[in-house]
Swiss-Prot record:
GO process terms (BP): mRNA processing; RNA splicing; tRNA processing
GO cellular component, one term: chloroplast
Record gene name: matK
UniProt family annotation: Belongs to the intron maturase 2 family. MatK subfamily.
Keywords linked to the UniProt accession: Chloroplast, mRNA processing, Plastid, RNA-binding, tRNA processing
Domain of life per record: Eukaryota
Stated name of the protein: Maturase K
Pfam families listed in its UniProt record: Intron_maturas2, MatK_N
HAMAP family in the record: MatK
Amino acid sequence: MEELQGYLEIDRSRQQHFLYPLLFQEYIYALAHDHGLNGSIFYEPMENFGYDNKSSSLIVKRLITRMHQQNHLILSVNDSNESIFVGHNKNFYFQMVSEGFAVIMEIPFSLRLVSSLEEKEIAKSHNSRSIHSIFPFFEDKLSHLNHVSDILIPHPIHLEILVQTLHCWIQDAPSLHLLRFFLHEYRNSNSLITPKKSISLFSKENQRFFLLLYNSHVYECESVLVFLRKQSSHLRSTSSGTFLERTHFYGKIEHLVVVLRNDFQKTLWLFKDPFMHYVRYQGKSILASKGTHLLMKKWKSHLVHFWQCHFYLWSLPDRIHINQLYNHFLYFLGYLSSVRLNTSVVRIQMLENSFLIDTSINKFETLVPIIPLIGSVAKAKFCNVSGHPISKSVRADSSDSDIINRFGRIYRNLSHYHSGSSKKQTLYRIKYILRLSCARTLARKHKSTVRAFLKRLGSEFLEEFLTEEEQVLSLIFQRTSSPSYRSHRERIWYLDIIRINDLANHS
């Protein structure tokens, strides 16, 4: 039990006590502007809120002045419904404060990361943050395993649980009170809490702020997996060192907040499995094992009980699915992954005798699902639900080259993300949709026909939709008889992709 106590201890020397005053510093909002995620408030057009870019610094100074006033950051018990963000710019001010608040709250986790890397002498590699690095790991590990569990991590049902989760990391009471105020204020005035009381995390506004809260919640949910995995393994497990999303905390620190101590050692043997692997991206995780179906059911039961006891979450049975790898497609990060048994016959000639040997190899395959991808493209209004390309409305002052570059960039980014597909037919279908949608958009702008417009542009229009992968592969396989066939089946994984493509995110 002494080792268990080590997991329950919190390193208080690194907890921050003076984060709240940083909220009144102008450079914090500059950091939020420079390092914010795409889609945050600072990357939205300022004219949408009635301001231009030149006055953004003035807005921050005005906001800090308002916060210095005594009544603006104090939540009164008697006037709990009164908002500090009065006026028609309430949402805008709230989003600015939440962006700066997220930058401040990330400071303790950044310090933990630096300290963890120094103690373990781990080089900080940006390549390990790529979500594409998961698939080579799958290819190396999953082909030798038997069962896989698709897990949807439940959302926090109560706001106070989110605050208490961060309380374990941060001892700055004013910051925690402000966080509690933010959550209740936004719940009362917006759609933070849905009718089912689940958190709306990945909205375009306040994305960094909600990612911080969500990542802390997910870390607590999976902490029990890290602890049990280390206890059950015959060899000492190695921390991954990084998370996958950009604003994750990048350090999987091995400690357990709450563990049932009764009959602990007696229960632990039920989960012993030296071939257990766990990966996660956002709210979906995968638990793969070489063990039996019974072992996976025990893991499922343990996770459900842990979430119920620790987070007061009632996890539905359909949030954890257990399947065999050999007859199941694993949907993860916009790919359909599977393990297929490939058989081949090898003829061996030895002097006067010859032998035929049957060999079977487990091959990991990744495919792009066509129906969900077309649904995402249709949702972005490039085509209808049947996949028929349609024109998009554009600004009258947009040049033809800008429109073509925009459509070409969308396809290149999508093709770049799905470059690991074993079959490229789905991407060619998407290329056709985007190319024809672009042509229809330009023809609509010039009040012409698509045929006449394509005839006028010629090959220059087609080159905009030629990806770097196709150019490189055409050079590599230019001496072979069928370079197109080779390029159709070549899988390429990139180590610079740190977030899922918006069109590939079908959830």
